[in-house]
Amino acid sequence: MKGYFNNEQANKDSFSGDWFRTGDVVVTDEDGDIFIVDRIKDMIKVKGYQVSPTELESEIRLAPGVADVAVIGVPHPQAGEAPRAFIVPSSEDVSVESVQEFLSGRLAKYKQLTGGIVIMESLPKSPTGKVLRKELRAL
């Protein structure tokens, strides 16, 4: 790959030697297979720790009565950012308190939803089904 045409700054920001920085966060399994698990731009920076929204969403989906969820980072005066969850319930029994109680022993303290929990009827999504996090940030 030769780079961006007439845009040296984009080349400096996007390339490291012959490697292109995609912004993807990946893991490698014991067989050497690579899996994309998140995006760097979506990572939440809490007190110097990188928190994966995907990891939090996976845990929240295990809570009884949760149909769908999205997590974003919101500004926090002491932590820099804090995770906030937007939850679509599958039953009327879901509450902010029930989700917090479910997560209390499952997540490290810095991964707790100190940015809050918002119960919604549906998440904003693109025509392809991708959560529109930008719209959630605007709420």
In which residue ranges do the predicted regions lie?
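AMP-binding/adenylate-forming catalytic core of the ANL superfamily
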Residues: 2-3, 10-13, 17, 25-111, ...
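AMP-binding/adenylate-forming catalytic domain of the ANL superfamily
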Residues: 108-130
